[in-house]
Regions:
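Transmembrane beta-strand segments that form the barrel wall of outer-membrane beta-barrel proteins
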Residues: 1, 57-60, 148-160, 185-192, ...
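Bacterial N-terminal signal peptides that target proteins for export
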Residues: 2-12
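Bacterial N-terminal signal peptides
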Residues: 12-24
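Short, glycine/acidic-rich beta->alpha junctions
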Residues: 69, 167, 232-236, 302-308
Length: 311
């Protein structure tokens, strides 16, 4: 009887381990896909799944063009293997804030076994599994990473009758760092190389853009961004912008409001005038015509001199 019990236990254990083999294979596929994406340079990469759907989360930092980067990620996920008999979703982040998702649903009886890029549906909907996906631990986090960029800047104007152009050429190194989800700190330094007619302040090394921005996503697919700091065109203040695509994603609403004043850098000292602060705003809509890959915008706006217009 003891031998029978031992044999029964051994059979049960073997059956249990046999059942775990597919689960192990699924986990290895998901983890290996995440590792491959991280190796390519993607940030904030993770995955999860339930009985109906597998979800990958990623942020493109490897490719300058978002479309190219997302396409490369889709190719890798397809090559590593899609889940059998369940859908797959890719959620694309921007500074840890979800933007769009790509959704693939296998069709039963489809003679084509290999999925292609055209089989993925792109939308702003994140699906029900996002509630679980937002809790997973992401690999290759973008937080606290410092990006160093160098921008050559060329400006010219034609205001003097005796001179064709007045020219300003700067080198502008900048750093960007994110300290929490959706946040970005940008600090720029302007180093004058050639200045002909742009004034004595542009002869000095001085800061350029210094801003803190916060991106967020509200319910009903409302995207927002708030920025505080020193902007271009000798402006400082706060600016908020919002974007809301409709269910028919060819149509969308756009809104922006800012409260800014005039200021300038004298070396590393910032000179500003609070009495110049005023409200600017913009409200409009957009239509995308996919047949001709063309977008039309119509906006009513108030500008820096309090003039209003439509464009």
């Amino acid at each position: 009887r003891k031998c029978l019990n031992t044999k029964t236990i051994a059979l049960c254990a073997a059956f249990f381990l046999y059942c775990l083999l597919p689960l192990k294979g699924i986990c290895q596929t998901g983890e290996s896909t995440v590792d491959a994406l991280v190796e390519m340079g993607f940030e904030n990469v993770g995955w999860t799944e339930d009985g109906n759907e597998r979800v990958y989360v990623l942020q493109n930092s490897a490719y300058r063009l978002q479309g190219v980067g997302i396409g490369k990620a889709v190719d890798v996920i397809q090559k590593m293997g899609l889940p059998e008999e369940k859908s797959c979703r890719i959620i694309v982040l921007d500074n840890n804030v979800p933007q769009i998702s790509l959704y693939y649903h296998p069709i039963k009886g489809d003679s084509v076994l290999q999925a292609e890029r055209d089989d993925w549906n792109v939308s702003y909907e994140l699906g029900d599994t996002w509630k679980n996906a937002r809790k997973i631990k992401l690999k290759n986090s973008s937080l606290f990473k410092i990006d160093v960029l160098v921008y050559p800047q060329l400006a010219f104007k034609n205001l003097v009758i005796t001179q064709i152009y007045q020219v300003l050429f700067d080198l502008s190194p900048a750093i960007e760092v994110s300290l929490w989800k959706g946040m970005k700190l940008t600090a720029q330094l302007k180093i004058p190389v050639y200045n002909d007619g742009y004034g004595r302040f542009e002869d000095k090394v001085h800061p350029g853009h210094i801003t803190i921005s916060q991106r967020f996503r509200l319910p009903y697919n409302v995207f927002g961004k708030v920025t505080v700091g020193c902007f271009s065109a000798d402006q400082y203040g706060v600016d908020a912008e919002f974007y809301r695509p409709f269910k028919d994603e060819r149509f969308s609403l756009m809104a922006r409001i800012g409260y800014t004043g005039m200021g300038y850098w004298s070396g590393f000292r910032y000179v500003y005038d609070p009495s110049t602060a005023l409200v600017t705003w913009s409200l409009g809509g957009s239509f995308y015509w996919p047949q001709f890959n063309t977008q039309f915008n119509l906006k009513a706006e108030q500008y820096l001199l309090k003039e209003k217009g439509v464009k």
